[in-house]
């Protein structure tokens, strides 16, 4: 079973992008890094085929400085909704470095956010490091507190997908 799904990522929820921009600004002057989680577009009220980035997962044990951020792979969850990665460049450069490209092999979309972390200070890339379109979408996201409200039936249904 693959960690990253092969279906196309059609956009990012505005709330998820806002969270990442704020987190990047708060982490400055160090790099910020997270993983992107997606849901089927229609499940979040978007009338399109494919996935929408709905969440940014912060991985415990991530170490960062002004030039890099490193995620501990042993702490990355086996999340079947993972669609890519996101990180900041405190120097504002919105191009992937060689080290970035080495991490782009898994996932369909990778986002780099640059200082000063405004609404247009980011770029999306494909696995090869080529710029790609990624629409900012108004998605119907669930209340984050509801994440912890589930039953065994919910778990079984998720595993059967």
Curated annotation (Swiss-Prot):
CDD domains referenced in this protein's UniProt entry, alphabetically: MPN_archaeal
SUPFAM superfamilies from the UniProt entry: JAB1/MPN domain (SSF102712)
One Gene Ontology biological process: proteolysis
InterPro entries: JAB_dom_prok, MPN
Residue positions of the active site: 31
Motif extent (JAMM motif): 87-100
Residues that bind Zn(2+): 87, 89, 100
Positions bearing the site annotation: Transition state stabilizer: 97
Keyword annotations from UniProtKB, A to Z: Hydrolase, Metal-binding, Metalloprotease, Protease, Zinc
Residue ranges constituting the MPN domain according to the UniProt record: 10-131
Cofactor(s) in the UniProt record: Zn(2+)
Protein's UniProt keywords contain Metal-binding: yes
Listed GO MF terms: metal ion binding; metallopeptidase activity
Domain of life (superkingdom): Archaea
Protein's UniProt keywords contain Metal-binding: yes
Subunit structure: Monomer and homodimer.
Role summary: Probable metalloprotease. Does not hydrolyze SAMP1- and SAMP2-protein conjugates, diglycine-AMC, Ub-AMC, hemoglobin, cytochrome c, carbonic anhydrase, creatinine phosphokinase, beta-amylase and bovine serum albumin.
Record protein name field: Probable metalloprotease HVO_1016
Native species: Haloferax volcanii (strain ATCC 29605 / DSM 3757 / JCM 8879 / NBRC 14742 / NCIMB 2012 / VKM B-1768 / DS2) (Halobacterium volcanii)
């Amino acid at each position: 079973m693959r960690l990253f799904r092969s279906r196309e990522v059609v956009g990012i929820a505005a709330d998820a992008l806002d969270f990442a921009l704020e987190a990047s600004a708060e982490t400055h002057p160090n790099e910020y890094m997270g993983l992107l989680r997606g849901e089927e577009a229609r499940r979040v009220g978007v009338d399109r085929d494919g996935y929408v980035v709905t969440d940014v997962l912060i991985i415990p044990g991530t170490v960062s400085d002004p030039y890099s951020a490193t995620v501990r792979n042993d702490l990355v969850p086996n999340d079947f909704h993972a669609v890519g990665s996101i990180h900041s460049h405190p120097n504002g450069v919105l191009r992937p470095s060689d080290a970035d490209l080495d991490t782009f092999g898994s996932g369909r979309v990778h986002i780099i956010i640059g200082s000063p972390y405004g609404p247009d200070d980011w770029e999306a890339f494909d696995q090869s490091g080529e710029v790609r379109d990624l629409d900012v979408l108004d998605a119907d996201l669930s209340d984050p507190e509801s994440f912890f409200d589930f039953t065994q039936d919910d778990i079984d249904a998720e595993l059967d997908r």
